[in-house]
UniProtKB/Swiss-Prot annotation:
Belongs to the UPF0303 family. The lineage of its organism: Bacteria, Pseudomonadati, Pseudomonadota, Betaproteobacteria, Burkholderiales. This is UPF0303 protein BTH_I2506. SUPFAM superfamilies: GlcG-like. NCBIfam families: PRK02487.1-4, PRK02487.1-5.
Length: 165
C-alpha cells in the first residue's frame, strides 16, 4: 500500500462523494445499502449513519460485537473533529509517526484514527455527519463505505476505489 497514493485517492473521494441534500430518508437508504452489501458478503460489521449529534441509522450484523460498536463511535468522532475520513487521518498520523493523543491530545478511548468512518458532506453546507462501518480490516471498512456512497450518489465505484494493494 502506498500511503501517499491512498491519501490522494481519499481526497478525491471526499471531494466527489457529496450529497445535494441529506435527510433521515437518505440516511436510511445509505445505511440499508451498506447492510445489504455486508449481508451479501457475510461481513460481521456495525453500521452507523449520523448527523453530528443525531443517530439516523444503526445496524449490528450477526457476528459483530460490542467492540465494533465502540470502534464505530470512536471513528465517527474522528470525522466530527477533523471533517475528514478516519482513514485519511490515520494515514496522516502514520506518515508523521504520531498518534492522535500525541499530536492533538485526543484520548484513545474517544477517538480511533482507523479506516471506516467517512464524512457526510452536503453541497453548500459542508460536512454534516458521518457514515461508519466497523468489523473488517480498516481499508475494507473504508472501501465498503465508499462503495455504498458511490451507489447512492450515482458514481462508478471502480473510478473512486483505492488502488489494490
Amino acid at each position: 500500500m502506498d500511503i501517499a497514493l491512498d491519501l490522494q485517492s481519499i481526497a478525491v473521494q471526499e471531494k466527489t462523494l457529496v450529497f445535494p441534500q441529506f435527510d433521515a430518508a437518505r440516511a436510511w437508504a445509505l445505511g440499508s445499502q451498506l447492510r445489504e452489501l455486508a449481508l451479501a458478503r457475510g461481513h460481521a460489521v456495525a453500521i452507523d449513519v449520523r448527523t453530528f449529534g443525531q443517530p439516523l441509522f444503526f445496524a449490528l450484523l450477526d457476528g459483530a460485537t460490542p467492540d465494533n460498536v465502540d470502534w464505530a463511535r470512536r471513528k465517527g468522532n474522528v470525522v466530527a473533529h477533523f471533517r475528514r475520513s478516519s482513514y485519511a487521518v490515520g494515514l496522516r498520523m502514520q506518515q508523521a509517526g504520531a498518534t492522535l493523543a500525541d499530536k492533538h491530545g485526543l484520548p484513545v478511548a474517544e477517538y480511533a484514527s482507523h479506516g471506516g468512518a467517512f464524512p457526510l458532506a452536503v453541497a453548500g453546507a459542508g460536512v454534516i455527519g458521518s457514515v461508519t462501518v466497523s468489523g473488517l480490516p480498516q481499508r475494507g471498512d473504508h472501501e465498503l463505505v465508499v462503495e455504498a456512497l458511490c451507489a447512492q450518489l450515482g458514481h462508478a465505484y471502480e473510478t473512486l476505489a483505492l488502488a489494490r494493494s
